[in-house]
């Protein structure tokens, strides 16, 4: 696991964007696994800047997102499809037909999950998977538990995750309780994984991810078993690392 510690959130975002940009330039037909949440927003802004300045071409890129809330349509302003469109896709030249997010309104969730895994397989797998870290160690919506699912699946969100995401909704009661998420198996099959984390609130989980015991109670620790992980954090998130 490679570790890069940056001064602050802004620098972390720039370093992460540069890392992804280099991979896109090396492989214009790259399959990117993308994430949502507060952490990658700065990185996406930097990628948009690079595109606007002629440094990046997304026309042949395929993207596949980690997760989506169950019960929200893609045009709901808190859905992850909406998040990706407004924070990245609408501002670059990616073909929207080559951007994939689970369908939160799927009538048959089990079929949707199986189809999502088949799609990833048909693409030849994910070349670069971007991950944020939940304060409780979740990656995607793979929450702490006795067992972790391999494939894309329906999951019940932990109370701590619901509380953390409540800031995006009018009320905590509006936060969906279920989500479709890629499983640990799909994430671990990615050829390369880039993890980004910022702020003191992520320091404990960053420490556990780097050197803690591998346990399903902290899903991020599973990344220790992957052959190519780069962890990009700011000083606050790295403060418990020796």
From Swiss-Prot:
Q: Which UniProt keywords apply?
A: Carbohydrate metabolism, Hydrolase
Q: Which domain of life is it from?
A: Bacteria
Which sites are catalytic?
67, 136, 138, 143
Pathway note: Amino-sugar metabolism; N-acetylneuraminate degradation; D-fructose 6-phosphate from N-acetylneuraminate: step 5/5
Q: Which GO terms describe its biological process?
A: carbohydrate metabolic process; glucosamine catabolic process; N-acetylglucosamine catabolic process; N-acetylneuraminate catabolic process
Q: Which CDD domains match?
A: GlcN6P_deaminase
NCBIfam families attached to this UniProt entry: nagB, PRK00443.1-4
Q: Write down the chemical reaction(s) this protein catalyses.
A: alpha-D-glucosamine 6-phosphate + H2O = beta-D-fructose 6-phosphate + NH4(+)
Which PROSITE patterns does the UniProt record give?
GLC_GALNAC_ISOMERASE (PS01161)
Output the InterPro entries linked to this UniProt entry. Glc/Gal-6P_isomerase (IPR006148), Glucosamine6P_isomerase (IPR004547), Glucosamine6P_isomerase_CS (IPR018321), NagB/RpiA_transferase-like (IPR037171)
Enzyme Commission number(s) from the entry: 3.5.99.6
A GO MF term: identical protein binding
User: Per the similarity annotation, which family is this?
Assistant: Belongs to the glucosamine/galactosamine-6-phosphate isomerase family. NagB subfamily.
Know the name of this protein?
Glucosamine-6-phosphate deaminase
Which enzyme class, named as a word?
hydrolase
Lineage of source species: Bacteria, Bacillati, Bacillota, Clostridia, Eubacteriales
What is this protein for, i.e. what is its function?
Answer: Catalyzes the reversible isomerization-deamination of glucosamine 6-phosphate (GlcN6P) to form fructose 6-phosphate (Fru6P) and ammonium ion.
């Amino acid at each position: 696991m490679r570790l890069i510690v940056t001064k602050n959130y802004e620098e972390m975002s720039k370093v992460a964007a540069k890392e992804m940009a280099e991979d896109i330039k090396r492989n214009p037909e790259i399959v990117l696994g993308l994430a949502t949440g507060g952490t990658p927003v700065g990185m996406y802004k930097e990628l948009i800047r690079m595109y606007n300045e002629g440094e990046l071409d997304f026309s042949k890129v395929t993207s596949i997102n980690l997760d989506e809330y169950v019960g929200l349509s893609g045009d709901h302003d808190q859905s992850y499809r909406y998040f990706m469109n407004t924070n990245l896709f609408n501002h670059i030249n990616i073909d929207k037909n080559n951007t994939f997010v689970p369908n939160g309104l799927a009538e048959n969730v089990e079929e949707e999950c199986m189809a999502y895994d088949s799609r990833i397989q048909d693409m030849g797998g994910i070349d670069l998977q971007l991950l944020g870290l939940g304060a409780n160690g979740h990656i995607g919506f793979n929450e702490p538990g006795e067992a972790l699912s391999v494939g894309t699946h329906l999951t019940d969100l932990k109370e701590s995750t619901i509380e953390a995401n409540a800031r995006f909704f009018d009320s905590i009661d509006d936060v969906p309780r279920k989500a479709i998420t890629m499983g640990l198996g799909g994430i671990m099959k990615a050829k390369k994984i880039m993890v980004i984390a910022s702020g003191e609130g992520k320091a404990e989980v960053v420490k556990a991810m780097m050197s803690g015991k591998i346990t399903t109670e902290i899903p991020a620790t599973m990344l220790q078993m992957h052959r190519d992980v780069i962890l990009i954090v700011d000083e606050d998130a790295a403060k418990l690392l020796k």
